[in-house]
Amino acid sequence: MAGKKEFSIFDHVLVPEHRVLSEEEKKALLEKYKITLAQLPQIKASDPAVKALGAKPGDVIEIKRKSPTAGVYYYYRVVVED
């Protein structure tokens, strides 16, 4: 069998831009919306995008999505164990 091919999932047209927030950004986000980490939507540590970013449980991922009506909007998820 041939060797395993590797590619960046972020190069695919359907995968929006992802990034891990710094601790300061995470704290500011939680304060801005007056929420806790438990109130954020979750994303599993086994998600291919999370693996590609090297994020670990407790990290917050910012997802930049494009919308035909809203232009660009940001979505936040907290990384959890599988």
Swiss-Prot record:
InterPro entries cross-referenced by the UniProt entry: Arch_Rpo5/euc_Rpb5 (IPR014381), RNA_pol_subH/Rpb5_C (IPR000783), RNA_pol_subH/Rpb5_CS (IPR020608), RPB5-like_sf (IPR035913)
Subcellular location: Cytoplasm
Cross-referenced Pfam families: RNA_pol_Rpb5_C (PF01191)
UniProt-listed GO biological process terms: transcription by RNA polymerase II; transcription elongation by RNA polymerase I; tRNA transcription by RNA polymerase III
GO terms under cellular component: cytoplasm; DNA-directed RNA polymerase complex
Keywords: Cytoplasm, DNA-directed RNA polymerase, Nucleotidyltransferase, Transcription, Transferase
Reactions catalysed according to its record: RNA(n) + a ribonucleoside 5'-triphosphate = RNA(n+1) + diphosphate
Domain of life of the source: Archaea
GO molecular function term, any single one: DNA-directed RNA polymerase activity
EC number: 2.7.7.6
Protein family according to the UniProt entry: Belongs to the archaeal Rpo5/eukaryotic RPB5 RNA polymerase subunit family.
Protein purpose: DNA-dependent RNA polymerase (RNAP) catalyzes the transcription of DNA into RNA using the four ribonucleoside triphosphates as substrates.
Subunit structure as annotated in this protein's UniProt entry: Part of the RNA polymerase complex.
Protein name: DNA-directed RNA polymerase subunit Rpo5
Lineage, opening ranks: Archaea, Methanobacteriati, Methanobacteriota, Thermococci, Thermococcales
